[in-house]
C-alpha cells in the first residue's frame, strides 16, 4: 500500500491511499486486487472521502483475529466505492455516506451481480454517530439498500417490462474499549438483505402478477452479534465469539434469493495467541463454527427441521510489517 500526504487545498489537508493484495480471482487465483483507493480532504472538524475503502458497517470497530474473514458473517465485511462525509464536534462524530458496489455484490435472481444496484439507480445510504472519549468508542448506524432485481419477465413466451424494487433498512450498534493492555470490542447488527457485506440473508418472493410476471419481495432479516477480547502487549491471548440468528421475513414467501437462506443459526468461537514485536507478528488460532441447516418455512421465511454441521479450523500466521 501507499499513503500520500499532499499540499493543502484551500483550508483542507489532502491525503490519498492506494492498497493492493493478491486475493483477487478471475480466470485464476491469487491475482492482484484493489483494496483501497481514495482521496481525503480534512478541514479539522470535518472531512470528505472520495473513493473505495471500508464499508461504514465495517467501520472503526472490527475484531482482531488472524482469520482473513475478519469475523464475517457476524461482522460486516466489504470495501466499496463511496462518498463519505464526517463531522466532529467535541467527542461526537457524525458520518454520512453514499455507496456503490464493486467487488462485494448483492445476491439476486442471477446470483451475485452489480446489475441490481445499477438498475436501481439508487446508492446505498449510511448514517451513523459515534462517541469517542480517550480509549472508549460507542456508536450506532443505519443503512439503506434499494435494489431492482429484474427489469423484465417472461410469461407464456411473452416478455414484459416490469418495475421491481426491494428496499430494506439495517441497524447496528458497536463499542470498543482500548487501553495499554486491553482491547474489548463488540458489535450487533439487525440486518436486512446485507449480502453485499459478506453476511447471510437476502429476500424472498411474496407475490407474482400472473399476467406480467412482476414480483414483489420481502427482505430476510438476520440478527448477528460478536465480542472480541484481547489482552497483553508482546504475548497477546485473545478470544472471539459470534452468533447469528435467522429471523425470517415479514411476509409469506415462495422462493428465496440470497446467501445462507437455509441456515437457521450460526455459532462461532475462536481462541488465539500471538507474539508481537516491532515489524513482526506470529500467531496461532483455533476456530470452531457450527451451522444449523434446514428447510424453508414459506409462511414466515424462517428455517425449520434443522440439523447442525460443525467445522474446525486451525490458522498459523507469520506477518512481517514494514
Model feature map: region roles:
Residues 1-104, 121-137, 176-190:
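Outer membrane beta-barrel
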Residues 29-31, 75-77, 119-122, 163-167, ...:
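Short sequence motifs at beta-strands and strand-loop junctions characteristic
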Residues 34-37, 79-83, 123-127, 169-173, ...:
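Hydrophobic, lipid-facing positions within transmembrane beta-strands of outer-membrane proteins
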Residues 277, 308-322:
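Outer-membrane beta-barrel "beta-signal"
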Residues 134-263, 267:
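Detector for outer-membrane/organellar transmembrane beta-barrel domains
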Residues 23, 66-71, 106-115, 152-162, ...:
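Extracellular loop and loop/strand-boundary signature of outer-membrane beta-barrel proteins
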Amino acid at each position: 500500500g501507499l499513503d500520500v500526504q499532499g499540499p493543502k487545498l484551500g483550508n483542507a489537508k489532502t491525503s490519498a491511499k492506494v492498497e493492493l493484495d493478491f486475493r483477487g480471482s478471475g480466470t485464476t487465483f491469487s491475482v492482484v486486487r484493489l483494496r483501497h483507493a481514495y482521496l481525503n480532504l480534512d478541514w479539522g472538524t470535518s472531512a470528505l472521502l472520495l473513493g473505495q475503502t471500508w464499508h461504514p458497517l465495517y467501520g472503526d470497530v472490527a475484531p482482531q483475529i488472524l482469520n482473513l474473514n475478519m469475523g464475517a458473517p457476524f461482522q460486516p465485511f466489504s470495501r466499496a466505492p463511496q462518498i463519505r462525509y464526517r463531522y466532529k464536534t467535541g467527542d461526537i462524530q457524525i458520518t454520512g455516506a453514499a455507496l456503490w458496489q464493486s467487488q462485494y455484490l448483492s445476491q439476486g435472481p442471477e446470483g451475485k451481480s452489480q446489475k441490481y444496484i445499477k438498475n436501481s439507480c439508487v446508492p446505498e445510504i449510511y448514517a451513523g454517530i459515534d462517541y469517542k472519549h480517550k480509549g472508549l468508542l460507542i456508536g450506532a448506524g443505519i443503512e439503506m439498500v434499494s435494489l431492482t432485481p429484474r427489469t423484465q419477465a417472461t410469461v407464456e413466451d411473452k416478455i414484459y417490462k416490469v418495475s421491481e424494487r426491494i428496499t430494506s433498512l439495517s441497524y447496528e450498534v458497536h463499542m470498543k474499549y482500548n487501553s495499554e493492555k486491553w482491547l474489548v470490542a463488540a458489535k450487533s447488527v439487525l440486518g436486512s438483505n446485507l449480502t453485499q457485506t459478506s453476511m447471510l440473508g437476502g429476500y424472498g418472493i411474496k407475490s407474482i402478477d400472473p399476467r406480467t410476471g412482476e414480483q414483489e419481495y420481502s427482505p430476510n432479516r438476520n440478527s448477528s452479534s460478536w465480542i472480541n477480547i484481547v489482552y497483553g502487549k508482546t504475548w497477546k491471548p485473545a478470544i472471539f465469539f459470534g452468533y447469528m440468528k435467522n429471523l425470517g421475513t415479514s411476509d409469506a414467501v415462495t422462493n428465496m434469493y440470497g446467501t445462507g437462506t437455509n441456515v437457521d443459526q450460526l455459532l462461532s468461537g475462536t481462541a488465539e495467541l500471538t507474539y508481537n514485536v516491532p515489524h513482526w507478528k506470529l500467531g496461532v488460532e483455533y476456530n470452531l463454527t457450527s451451522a444449523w441447516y434446514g428447510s424453508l418455512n414459506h409462511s414466515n421465511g424462517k428455517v425449520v427441521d434443522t440439523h447442525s454441521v460443525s467445522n474446525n479450523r486451525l490458522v498459523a500466521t507469520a506477518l512481517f510489517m514494514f
